[in-house]
Amino acid sequence: MSALTVAVAGVLATATAGGCAHTVGGTAQREEGSVPDPDRSYGYVDDRCGLLDDSTVQATLGADNVIRPYSGAVCQYILSRPGSVTVDVTFSWFDAGSLTREREVAAQRGAVLKDVVVERHQAFSARRDVTGAACSATAAAGTGVLSWWVQYRGQKTGDPCVDAVKLLTATLRSDM
């Protein structure tokens, strides 16, 4: 390698390093206001709620049995787990809903809120133990918001937010 090549390489390296040594103030912020799948529908289709069939809901929550007494804009489930534990679950999708609105309602009802990101979607969990350990996980999705609410009937212990987030994750991962 010639002395000229080494000198040019040295000057370029110094100029490049000097140009990159710039500090930017502030705090990085996540982009808000968009969802990864703005045109996707999460409504009740083909006997599935939130794109999940009953067996997927049952397997996701480790239940022995699942009953869906109501389906439509809102779907209700009653699951039984080993040890005589009954779990009440509700799915809802509001196609023109707002994550901000759902968050405000949860706060007004006294829920403990926690911001989360689920499958690249802005979301939050809302824990509110009134008639049993209960939690919802809600995300901006498609044109609106979807939510899974889980309550351990008659139980004051456990973390239903884990199960609500599992169902939300399964929904956001689903392909029609």
Describe each PLM feature range.
Residues 4-10, 32-37, 58-66, 146-149:
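Short, intrinsically disordered, charge-biased short linear motifs at domain edges
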Residues 45-63:
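Amphipathic alpha-helical segments
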Residues 62-127:
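Short, solvent-exposed recognition patches
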Residues 109-176:
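A short, solvent-exposed beta-edge/loop patch
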Residues 1-19:
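Sec-dependent bacterial lipoprotein signal peptides
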Residues 18, 47, 73, 133, ...:
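Extracellular secreted precursors and ectodomains with disulfide-bonded cysteine-rich loops/domains
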Residues 29-48:
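Post-signal peptide N-terminal segment of mature Sec-exported envelope proteins
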Residues 21-24:
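Bacterial signal peptide processing site
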